[in-house]
Every structure is written in structure tokens, then in C-alpha cells.
Amino acid sequence: MYTSSLRAITIKVLLDNEPFLPGLRLDWGLSILVEGRGGPRLLMDTGSSASRLLGNAEELGVDLANLDGIFISHWHGDHCGGLPGLLDITGSIDVFVPREPGWLMKRELRGKGARLVVLRGPARLVDGFYSTGDLGGEHSLIADVEGLGLAVLTGCSHPGLDLIVRTASSYLRKPVHALIGGFHISSYYEGRKLGTFLAQQGLKVVCPCHCTGSPAKRGLRDVLGDVVLQCGVGMELKLEARGGASKQARGPVG
């Protein structure tokens, strides 16, 4: 299928339960800003607290008042808890969701200007950005980067990363280059098993965070080596085709 790709993207982790840069607030939750060069700006998830999200954004010099959309991976409080407070800043805005929330939450969000866009199947969001569609109550965000392939951002990966990666690749008929987010695994064995699958899929950048345990990260690193990057609050990752390479913020895996 035809897709409009992005020349480059910048990914910034605004909330996570692990640190990367000092002086930022931690949260058992996740929020990641994805910016296309000269193009759309989408925020995936809002963590559990708008005050922590907005505080970190201010500390990092990130303007959340001018987004092109908000992407909620699933309706767990550690991923959507900051949404009502964020809407006080953004005003009327598209909020891409896999399913509608409960009626009380829906009424509150619509009252604050949220235009809930329910994505039951794979779909284009804005130029260069797509959704896997609802995979059992959760969807993942896809960015199509020209010359590299796909960057897939996951909330908690409850549907399983094999399904998420294959759905993204099949929908856009391109390989997945990068995977960032919560992987929902804890043990060393699970990390090695996932690492083997991701190696078979040819991934070049893997950034586990949120609900990915330290033993699982070690298992991933033992299989994938330097493909696995440290992630945490304040981490910034730039993906751009330069002779087939990508520019990354690298660091040791905890």
C-alpha cells in the first residue's frame, strides 16, 4: 500500500519509571513524544499524572500545547491517567484510541475537547503515522521513516510483541527498524526468547522500558548486543536514514 513516510523522527521519553537524565520526575507509567522533522507531533500515552508529565515537559523544553494528536495505547491508568489534565493545555484535539473508555471517562474527556478516534483496525493517523489497530484492547503507534523502515512504539505490549511487529510490518509492507516501549516481560529467559525473534525480524534499534524487567533487558542484550539501548525519562532518540544508518542516543542497559 502507498504510505507517506517521514524524513526523520525524534523520540523523547517524557515519563517512565526508570531515569535517564537527572532531575526529572519518575512515574510508573509511560509517555513518549514523537516528532517528524518539519511534520506532525504525536504524544503516545500520558502516564498516570498530568503534573509529572507537564513538569518534565517544561524541564525538557517541550511544548505540549501544540500537538497534532494524542495516542492512547490502552485504558490503563498508568497510560491514560494524565490525559484529562493534558487536555486542559491542548484544548480540542484528536485522541486516537483502540476502544472507547467507560462512559464517565468518555464524558469527561469530551467535555475537555477530546475528539475520540476509535481504531478497530490498522489505520493512517496523520502523515507518516499509523496504528496497528485494536489488538485485544491495545494498539501500537507506527512511524514510517524514509529509508529505514518502521519505528513501532508500544504501551505495554499485552497482545504480544510477535503479533504487534508482524501486524505493523504486514500492514505497511515494510520491515520494522526500531521498537520502543513497554515489552511486558520480566525474566532473563523471556528476554532471550524475544531477542531471538527480534533478531530474526532484522530490528536495528530496541529500547525496552516501563514494564520490562531488568533480567529481561539483560536477556535481550545478550542476544542483540548494542542493538539494545538504555531507555528512561529524558532519553532522546533520533532516527534518520544516512547511508542506511540511524542516529541514536546510546547508553548501557540496566
Predicted features and spans:
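Metallo-beta-lactamase
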Residues: V97-S140, E146-G147, L229-G243, K247, ...
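Cap/insert and terminal regions of metallo-dependent hydrolase folds
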Residues: H79-G82, G149-L150, C156-L237
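Active-site metal-binding motif and surrounding structural segment of the metallo-beta-lactamase
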Residues: S51-F96, S169-L179, A199, K204
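N-terminal amphipathic/basic leader segments beginning at the initiator methionine
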Residues: Y2-L15, R124-F129
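General beta-strand structural signal in soluble alpha/beta enzymes
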Residues: I11-V13, M44, V97, V117-V118, ...
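Active-site metal-binding loops of divalent metal-dependent hydrolases
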Residues: L15-E18, T46-S48, W75, E100-P101, ...
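Catalytic core of the metallo-beta-lactamase
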Residues: G23, S31-E35, V117-R173
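Conserved beta-strand hairpin/beta-sheet module of binuclear metal-dependent hydrolase folds
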Residues: I9-L60, H139-T154
